[in-house]
Amino acid sequence: MYSGAGPVLASPAPTTSPIPGYAFKPPPRPDFGTTGRTIKLQANFFEMDIPKIDIYHYELDIKPEKCPRRVNREIVEHMVQHFKTQIFGDRKPVFDGRKNLYTAMPLPIGRDKVELEVTLPGEGKDRIFKVSIKWVSCVSLQALHDALSGRLPSVPFETIQALDVVMRHLPSMRYTPVGRSFFTASEGCSNPLGGGREVWFGFHQSVRPSLWKMMLNIDVSATAFYKAQPVIEFVCEVLDFKSIEEQQKPLTDSQRVKFTKEIKGLKVEITHCGQMKRKYRVCNVTRRPASHQTFPLQQESGQTVECTVAQYFKDRHKLVLRYPHLPCLQVGQEQKHTYLPLEVCNIVAGQRCIKKLTDNQTSTMIRATARSAPDRQEEISKLMRSASFNTDPYVREFGIMVKDEMTDVTGRVLQPPSILYGGRNKAIATPVQGVWDMRNKQFHTGIEIKVWAIACFAPQRQCTEVHLKSFTEQLRKISRDAGMPIQGQPCFCKYAQGADSVEPMFRHLKNTYAGLQLVVVILPGKTPVYAEVKRVGDTVLGMATQCVQMKNVQRTTPQTLSNLCLKINVKLGGVNNILLPQGRPPVFQQPVIFLGADVTHPPAGDGKKPSIAAVVGSMDAHPNRYCATVRVQQHRQEIIQDLAAMVRELLIQFYKSTRFKPTRIIFYRDGVSEGQFQQVLHHELLAIREACIKLEKDYQPGITFIVVQKRHHTRLFCTDKNERVGKSGNIPAGTTVDTKITHPTEFDFYLCSHAGIQGTSRPSHYHVLWDDNRFSSDELQILTYQLCHTYVRCTRSVSIPAPAYYAHLVAFRARYHLVDKEHDSAEGSHTSGQSNGRDHQALAKAVQVHQDTLRTMYFA
C-alpha cells in the first residue's frame, strides 16, 4: 500500500501490563523533525533567566477560613507590614492567595509553627484574623536547571509552581485574576455585549519549561464580565426594556424566570445605607412584588409580625419605593428570608460571567476581540513593556530576569497531501494554503439518490413553492456535477409546523416510501425543530436527515449547495475523497485504526446536566469513513468512564468493515488539560488495552496516545512580512514547531494545519503520552497533518485531525438528542434534558443512536 521513499516503521514495542498504581511515563522525544521548508517565526514566549538558588516554601493557615483570595492577599500584606521588625525584615514574600508563601531568604522562625494575629480595617468594624506560618521545604532552582538540560528525568512540579507564584504576585494585587489571566475594566471605553455583560481585556501569563530555558508565555486575552450598574438597569438589559418606566405592571412569570436565571449567584451591593455598601450574593428572585412580599419582623416588644418589604423600607429607612410592583432579590442563605428591593442594589464590579454567552453575544465578542496576527504581536509586545517584569520588586527579590523580546523559533512548513477524487478523470487536488476546490471533480464514491423527501418547517409565505422548486433544481444540478446524482423529483414535499409534527411526519414517510434514503428539512432560523429532527432521525427511526436554513433555499449559491452535497454523500455511505495512497506515511503498510475521543461538558453554572463522551473510529484504509460511539457520564467527569466498551465496539466494527484486525491503534484525545495528563493516560490507556485483550487473549496492537490541545496561549508569528498569509497576516497552513518552545524532554509539537481566516491562528498542540509504535517526529507530524485534510464537511484542511473533530461533533449532536421537548428551551447546546432530573438510564438511552444509523456518519 505504501510506495515511495521513507522509513519503514519499527514493529510495535511489547506492551507490558503494568502493576496497579504504576504511573505511565510519557515517551522521550525520539528526534527532531526535519521535513518541510524552514520558516523563521517568533513565539509569544519570553526567556527567563533564573538563578541557581533555593527558595523557601511556607504554609499559611488563615482563620476564619473560606475568605476570597483577594482578602487573603490583603491579610498577608498587612501581616508582612505589621511584623516587619520581628519576622519579615526587608524580605518581600510572595503568596498564592490560598496557603503557599515563598521567600528568597529563610524567615527567622526555624521549623516551628508561628501563630500571628492580623487586623484588617473594615467598612464597619475591624476584622481580626489568626494566621499560622509553618516551614514546608526548600525548593531548589538548581534542580530545575538540571531538568531543563535533560540531566534530570522530569521537571520538578514544585519549582514551576514557586516561580509561577513569584511572577503572579504583583499582577494579582493590581488586577482581577481569572484562571491564569488578569483583567481590568477598559478605561474610558466600554465594550457592551448586551444582557448586562461587557468585554474586559487583559493578559494571560504562565511559566513554562522548555528546552534549556524557562519561558514566560504572555498573550492578550478577553472575557465577559457583568457590567457594574444599578440592578434596575440590569433588569432592563436582560428583559429588553428601553427603560424601566415602560414596565408599570409586575413581571410576568416568564420574565421573572429569565431575570432569575441571569442574576442568581451574582453579588450585589446596597445603596440605601450611606457609606456602608454591604455586599450580598443573590440566591433567588421573589414571586411577589415588594409591595406584597412579606417577612417575619421582630418588634421591640419581642412579638413577630408579617411586614411587607415596601412598608419596612418606608418605616425603617424613610424610603418610599419607586418601583413597588417589581420583585425583590432574595440574598444570603435561602432560609434566612433577607429581601432587597431591586432599586437599592447595584451589581458589584469585577464579576466574571461564567454562564454561556448567547449567539449574538458570542459574535459581538469575536468582533471586539479578533486581531490580525501583526496587531496581536504588537499588543503582546506593548503588554510586555507595560508589565516591565524587570522592575517588579517581587521578581527582582528572587533574582529573576525576563527578556522583553519574543523568542525566535525556526519552524517548518510541511507539504500538504494530494487529495484523490473519483469519476472518470480521477482528478487529484493539491491544497494551496490549506484550501482546494471541487470544480471539475467528482466524489471518489458518489451515492445515487433515488428516493428522497422534503419537509419544509419554514412558513409557506416566506419559503414559497417557487423557492422549493428552484432549490430542488439547483441542488440536483450541483449534485450531478459532484457525482452524487439525485434522480427525479422528491417523492414527498410538504409544509409542516412545530417540533411536535416531526415524529408523526417522519413515521409516515418511513412507512409509506420504501427505500427512502434522505429527508431534506428546511428550517426558519434557530428553532426547537432542529433538535427534534435529529432526535427522531438519528435515535428513534434511523433516517438520514439534512437540515437547510430557509435563507439558503430562498437564495441558493453553488457554494452552499456544494457544501450540502459534501455532507449528504457521506451520510448516505459515500466517500468524498481520499488521501493519495502513494503519499501516505509508512504506518499505512499494516491495518491501522484511527480513534478520536472527546468529552464535552455542560455550560458552567449548570450542575445537573451530564457530560458526554464520544469516541469515533476509522472504518477503512483511506481513512475516510468513521463510526461513532457515545455515552453520558457524570457531570464534569473528564476521564471517559466506558472507554473499554466503546473501543471494543469500534474494533469489532472495523473488523466487520475491513476483515482485518488493526495492528496499530492511533488515539487522538481532545479536551485534556496538562494537569490531567497522568490521570487520563493511566485510566484510558488501560481501557484501550482491556478492550483488545477482551476480544482476544493475545491481541496486543501497538497503541499511540496523543493529546490534542487547542485551548492554550501559544501564538506564532512570521518574522518575514512576505511569509504572512491572507488578510490577517497569519502563519502558513502546515507550520510545525518542535524546538525551543516545546517540552524539554517529552514528545510534543505545535502544528498549525489550517489557514487562519479571522484573527490570529491558534496552532494545535500535540503531546504524545504513549507510543508503542515508535514514531519518528517527522512521521507523526506528517500523519497528523494529512489527517487534518480528511474532514468531510469542507474542502479545506482543519485545525485538528478529522477523528478528533468528529468526536467533538458526535458529542455535540448527543446534546441535541438529550433535549427534552417538555422541559427545555431550544437553545441548542445549552440544553440537555436533565432539567427535570431524568435519571442516568433514561439519559443513556436518549443518546443511543438507532441500529440503522449506527454504521453511518450521521454526525457529518
UniProtKB/Swiss-Prot annotation:
UniProt key word Repeat: no
Tissue specificity of this protein: Ubiquitous expression in 9.5 day embryos with highest levels in forebrain, heart, limb buds, and branchial arches.
GO cellular component entries: cytoplasm; cytosol; dendrite; extracellular exosome; glutamatergic synapse; nucleus; P-body; postsynapse
Location(s), subcellular: Cytoplasm, P-body; Nucleus
Main location: cytoplasm
Positions annotated to bind a divalent metal cation: 598, 670, 808
Keyword terms of this UniProt record: Cytoplasm, Developmental protein, Differentiation, Endonuclease, Hydrolase, Hydroxylation, Magnesium, Manganese, Metal-binding, Nitration, Nuclease, Nucleus, Phosphoprotein, Repressor, Ribonucleoprotein, RNA-binding, RNA-mediated gene silencing, Transcription, Transcription regulation, Translation regulation, Ubl conjugation
Post-translational modification: Hydroxylated. 4-hydroxylation appears to enhance protein stability but is not required for miRNA-binding or endonuclease activity.
Positions of modified residues (4-hydroxyproline): 701
Signal peptide: none
InterPro entries hit by this protein: AGO2, ArgoL1, ArgoL2, Argonaute_Mid_dom, Argonaute_N, PAZ_dom, PAZ_dom_sf, Piwi
Residue ranges annotated for the Piwi domain, each copy included: 518-819
Knockout or disruption consequences: Embryonic death with a strong defect in neural tube closure and apparent cardiac failure.
Region (Interaction with GW182 family members) location: 588-591, 651-661
Cofactor(s) of this protein: Mg(2+); Mn(2+)
Listed Pfam families: ArgoL1, ArgoL2, ArgoMid, ArgoN, PAZ, Piwi
EC number assigned by the record: 3.1.26.n2
Modified residues (Phosphoserine): 388, 825, 829, 832, 835
Catalytic reaction annotation: Endonucleolytic cleavage to 5'-phosphomonoester
One GO molecular-function entry: mRNA cap binding
Keyword Flavoprotein among record annotations: no
Protein family per UniProt: Belongs to the argonaute family. Ago subfamily.
Function: Required for RNA-mediated gene silencing (RNAi) by the RNA-induced silencing complex (RISC). The 'minimal RISC' appears to include AGO2 bound to a short guide RNA such as a microRNA (miRNA) or short interfering RNA (siRNA). These guide RNAs direct RISC to complementary mRNAs that are targets for RISC-mediated gene silencing. The precise mechanism of gene silencing depends on the degree of complementarity between the miRNA or siRNA and its target. Binding of RISC to a perfectly complementary mRNA generally results in silencing due to endonucleolytic cleavage of the mRNA specifically by AGO2.
Domain free text: The Piwi domain may perform RNA cleavage by a mechanism similar to that of RNase H. However, while RNase H utilizes a triad of Asp-Asp-Glu (DDE) for metal ion coordination, this protein appears to utilize a triad of Asp-Asp-His (DDH).
SUBUNIT field: Interacts with DICER1 through its Piwi domain and with TARBP2 during assembly of the RNA-induced silencing complex (RISC). Together, DICER1, AGO2 and TARBP2 constitute the trimeric RISC loading complex (RLC), or micro-RNA (miRNA) loading complex (miRLC). Within the RLC/miRLC, DICER1 and TARBP2 are required to process precursor miRNAs (pre-miRNAs) to mature miRNAs and then load them onto AGO2. AGO2 bound to the mature miRNA constitutes the minimal RISC and may subsequently dissociate from DICER1 and TARBP2. Note however that the term RISC has also been used to describe the trimeric RLC/miRLC.
Protein name in UniProt: Protein argonaute-2
Source organism of this protein record: Mus musculus (Mouse)
